[in-house]
Structure formats: structure tokens, C-alpha cells
């Protein structure tokens, strides 16, 4: 996925909290684990136009990291933020922030990386990579829905 791109989901009603589970095998390139879309929904007015509503994802589990090899492998976890919603009105950020760098995962071990309760907004991407291809499996669960308080024109 290219940076500065927000996927838009056209729907008649966006979800409040659709549960999603993701399991992926990491490579030496950053692999997207959570990508948050916007929702194109009907505007409740005469004439039937649509409006863009930003999406939001809430992490409900730790990132489970499992090493399938006998050797210690290292992983990095980062988030790409498109907007800063702590500002009013939201401002463009388009920056990548490291959450963890070179976490050692011992051979045949499984570790939880706590992300429970973290929020990601439309355009945000949570990514992870390993220093060895196909040695690490990761699993994370989250809910995705519409961030109603941040309606866009």
C-alpha cells in the first residue's frame, strides 16, 4: 500500500465494531497488519448524497509473535500515521513512528507485545518486519468501525 492513501469502503451502514483477526508471516519488508479505511455512507438528507466518515480500529489483543525457527530472530513494529486527531481540527502528519525496534524472539518461543486498547484512525497502518524471512508468525485481533465524531466533507 502506498503512503498517504486511505482506502474507502462504500456501504449503506458502516460497522460500529466489526471484529477482525489477522495472522501473517513476516518478511524483511514491513508487512501491514492493520489498515484503517474511511467509510462512504449515505447522508440522512433528502436527495440521497453520501458523506465520508473516517474509520477507527481498536486493538483488543496483544500482538502475538511466534518464532518458528531454532534461532533468535528480531522484529520491528511501527505505525504510519496519516492524521493527528488530537488536534482540533485534525492536521496532516504523514509520519512513521517506531513502537519497537529489534525485539529479540528466542528460537521456538512465543511472546505477546502489548497493544491492547491502542486506537488507529483512517489512513493509519500498523506494520511489522523481521530480520529473517518466513521465521516469524504474528497474530492480532482488533475491531474496526466508523469514527463518528470526525466526519469529513
Q: Locations of the language-model features?
A:
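C-terminal interaction-tip segments
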Residues: 2-56, 68, 122, 129-153
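Short acidic, flexible loop segments centered on an aromatic residue
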Residues: 62, 66-88, 130, 142-143
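Intrinsically disordered, low-complexity Pro/Gly/Ser/Thr-rich segments with frequent PxxP/GP/PP motifs
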Residues: 83-125
Amino acid at each position: 500500500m502506498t503512503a498517504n492513501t486511505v482506502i474507502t469502503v462504500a456501504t449503506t451502514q458502516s460497522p460500529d465494531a466489526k471484529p477482525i483477526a489477522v495472522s501473517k508471516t513476516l518478511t524483511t519488508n514491513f508487512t501491514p497488519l492493520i489498515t484503517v479505511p474511511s467509510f462512504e455512507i449515505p447522508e440522512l438528507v433528502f436527495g440521497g448524497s453520501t458523506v465520508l466518515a473516517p474509520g477507527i480500529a481498536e486493538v483488543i489483543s496483544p500482538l502475538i509473535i511466534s518464532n518458528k525457527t531454532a534461532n533468535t530472530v528480531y522484529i520491528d513494529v511501527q505505525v504510519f500515521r496519516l492524521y493527528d486527531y488530537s488536534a482540533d481540527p485534525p492536521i496532516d502528519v504523514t509520519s512513521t513512528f517506531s513502537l519497537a525496534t529489534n525485539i529479540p524472539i528466542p528460537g521456538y518461543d512465543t511472546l505477546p507485545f502489548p497493544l491492547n486498547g491502542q486506537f488507529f484512525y483512517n489512513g493509519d497502518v500498523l506494520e511489522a518486519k523481521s530480520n529473517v524471512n518466513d521465521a516469524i508468525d504474528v497474530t492480532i485481533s482488533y475491531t474496526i468501525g466508523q469514527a463518528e465524531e470526525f466526519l469529513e466533507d
